UniProtKB/Swiss-Prot annotation:
Family: Belongs to the peptidase C13 family.
Site (described: Required for post-translational maturation and enzyme activity): 256
Protein name: Vacuolar-processing enzyme
Active site residues according to the UniProt entry: 167, 209
Length: 484
C-alpha cells in the first residue's frame, strides 16, 4: 500500500513538473527526442563539427573556385561552426587581383553577397598543396609545410565535412602548388583517418571534371564516408554565372562566378532550415539542377561510399542559419533557378575572349589580351597533338584512338598501378611540358598506357620523338613543378 502511495505521489510530482515546463513554453517533443548532435549554438554535446574547404586553382580566370570556397565558409559560419574548426585552403590571389573590378570583394552569384570578408588564411599561396591537405585531414601537424598549422584535431564522435572545388581529370584533382591530388592517395588518406578512430561520419562534396573517378572503385562503403561528386567518372563539370550566359555576372566581370554543382548545394543550404533536410534530399535536388541542361550542358551528380549516411540531416555537418528556422525543406518548392553553364575546361577561354572583346582596338590591353588568347590556344593544341602522337607511336595509327580513350566498366578504378600513372605523367611532362589544368583531361590516356603494360622507357622514347620542343608560354612551363 505504501509503495502504491509513493508511486502515485511521484507521478503527481512528475505531472506538475511537465505542466510547469509547458507553461514556460518548452518544446517537450524537441527536448526529449532531439538528436544527439542537435545543438542550437552549433556546439554538439556529443561531438564537434569540422570542415576543410579546398580551392585547387589560382589565376583570375579561375575566380569561381575560390568564390565557391569563400561562400561555403560563410555558410558554415552562419551554421554555427567556429573558425577554429574550419580549415581553408585557397591561393588567395583573387580578391585583390588587378583584374577584380571590386577590390577586396568576392561574389559567388550575380546578385550575391560579398563572401571574402573574414575567411581564414590558413593555407594560401604555395602552401596550398596536396601534402598539406592530407596532413591537415589526418591531424598531423608534424607533416605540415607552412600555413597556420591548423589541422582537424577530431575525436571519435565528431562529424567532418570536406568541400573541394577546382579542375580535375580522370583520377586527379588540381592543386595550385606541387603535384596534383591523385585518387589513390586521397582514398588511402581517408582510410587512414578512419583507422585512427577520430571521426564518427565524414561527408565529402567534390566539384571537378571527371570527379566520379576519384571515388569509383576506390572508396570503401564501410568507413563512414559519404561522397557526392559534380560529375561521373568520364564527363566534365560546369562553371556557371559566366559572361554571355543567363544569368550573367555584372558587366564589369570577365569571368565565371561559380560552379553549377557548387552553387546548387550552397544556394539550397542558404535557403532552408538544415535540421529539416537530409543529405539525400539535397543530393536529389542538386542532381536535378546540375543536369538541367540535358544534351547541351550539365553533368550527372553521383554518390559513393556509405550511401546509408545520406539519411542524416545536413545540420549534423553544416549546422544551420538561425534566420532559416521557419524555412522547412519541401521538395516541390525548394527555390532553385535554372542557370546556363560553361564546360569547366572552356571557362578560361570565356575569360580571355571576354577580355579581348572588351579591350579598345589598338590599345596595349587589346594586344595583351590577344597574346593571352593565342598562348592558351597554342598550349591546348600542343597538348592534344602531343598525346595523340605519343599514342600513335606506342600503339600504331589505327589502334591508338581506341586504346587511349577506352573507358573501364562502371565500378572499376581508373588504373591498377597508380605509381605507373604518375610515372607516365612525369615522363610525358619532362619532354612535352606541363599538362596544366587543361591537360588533366588526358589522364585516362596515360592510365590506359599503364593498363596495357607500357613501360617507362617506351614512354620516354615516344615522348621524346613527339615533342622536339616545349612551347615558350606560361601554360607549358614546368616552373611550378611536375603534376606527379
Amino acid at each position: 500500500m505504501a509503495t502504491t502511495t509513493a508511486t502515485t505521489s511521484l507521478l503527481a510530482l512528475l505531472l506538475l513538473f511537465l505542466v510547469a515546463l509547458v507553461s514556460a513554453g518548452r518544446d517537450l517533443v524537441g527536448d526529449f527526442l532531439r538528436l544527439p548532435s542537435d545543438s542550437g549554438n552549433g556546439d554538439n554535446v556529443h561531438g564537434t563539427r569540422w570542415a576543410i574547404l579546398f580551392a585547387g586553382s589560382s589565376g583570375y580566370w579561375n575566380y569561381r573556385h575560390q568564390a565557391d570556397i569563400c561562400h561555403a565558409y560563410q555558410l558554415l559560419r552562419k551554421g554555427g561552426l567556429k573558425d577554429e574548426n574550419i580549415i581553408v585552403f585557397m591561393y588567395d590571389d583573387i580578391a585583390f587581383n588587378s583584374e577584380n573590378p571590386r577590390r577586396g570583394v568576392i561574389i559567388n552569384s550575380p546578385n550575391g553577397d560579398e563572401v571574402y570578408k573574414g575567411v581564414p588564411k590558413d593555407y594560401t599561396g604555395e602552401d596550398v598543396t596536396a601534402h598539406n591537405f592530407y596532413a591537415a585531414l589526418l591531424g598531423d601537424k608534424s607533416k605540415l609545410t607552412g600555413g597556420s598549422g591548423k589541422v582537424v584535431n577530431s575525436g571519435p564522435n565528431d562529424h567532418i565535412f570536406i568541400f573541394y572545388s577546382d579542375h580535375g581529370g580522370p583520377g586527379v584533382l588540381g592543386s595550385p602548388a606541387g603535384p596534383y591530388i591523385y585518387a589513390s592517395d586521397l582514398n588511402e588518406v581517408l582510410k587512414k583517418k578512419h583507422a585512427s578512430g577520430t571521426y564518427k561520419n565524414l561527408v565529402f562534396y567534390l566539384e571537378a571534371c571527371e570527379s566520379g573517378s576519384i571515388f569509383e572503385g576506390l572508396l570503401p562503403e564501410d568507413i563512414n564516408v559519404y561522397a557526392t561528386t559534380a560529375s561521373n567518372a568520364d564527363e566534365s563539370s560546369w562553371g556557371t554565372y559566366c559572361p554571355g550566359e543567363d544569368p550573367s555576372p555584372p558587366p564589369e566581370y570577365s569571368t565565371c562566378l561559380g560552379d553549377l554543382y557548387s552553387v546548387a548545394w550552397m544556394e539550397d543550404s542558404d535557403r532552408h532550415n538544415l535540421r529539416t533536410e537530409t543529405l539525400h534530399q539535397q543530393y536529389k535536388l542538386v542532381k536535378e539542377r546540375t543536369i538541367s541542361g540535358g544534351l547541351y550542358y550539365g553533368s550527372h551528380v553521383m554518390q559513393y561510399g556509405d550511401v546509408g549516411l545520406s539519411k542524416d540531416i545536413l545540420f549534423h555537418y553544416l549546422g544551420t542559419d538561425p534566420a532559416n528556422e521557419n524555412l522547412t525543406f519541401v521538395d516541390e518548392n525548394s527555390l532553385w533557378s535554372s542557370s546556363k553553364a560553361v564546360n569547366q575546361r572552356d571557362a578560361d577561354l570565356v575569360h580571355f575572349w571576354d577580355k579581348f572583346r572588351k579591350a579598345p582596338e589598338g590599345s596595349p590591353k587589346k594586344n595583351e589580351a590577344r597574346k593571352q588568347v593565342l598562348e592558351v590556344m597554342s598550349h591546348r593544341m600542343h597538348i592534344d597533338d602531343s598525346v595523340e602522337l605519343v599514342g600513335k607511336l606506342l600503339f600504331g595509327i589505327e589502334k591508338a584512338p581506341e586504346l587511349l580513350n577506352a573507358v573501364r566498366p562502371a565500378g572499376s578504378a581508373l588504373v591498377d598501378d597508380w605509381d605507373c600513372l604518375k610515372t607516365m605523367v612525369r615522363t610525358f611532362e619532362t619532354h612535352c611540358g606541363s599538362l596544366s589544368q587543361y591537360g588533366m583531361k588526358h589522364m585516362r590516356s596515360f592510365a590506359n598506357m599503364c593498363n596495357v603494360g607500357i613501360k617507362k622507357e617506351q614512354m620516354r622514347e615516344a615522348s621524346a620523338q613527339a615533342c622536339v620542343t616545349i612551347p615558350a608560354n606560361p601554360w607549358s612551363s614546368l616552373q611550378r613543378g611536375f603534376s606527379a
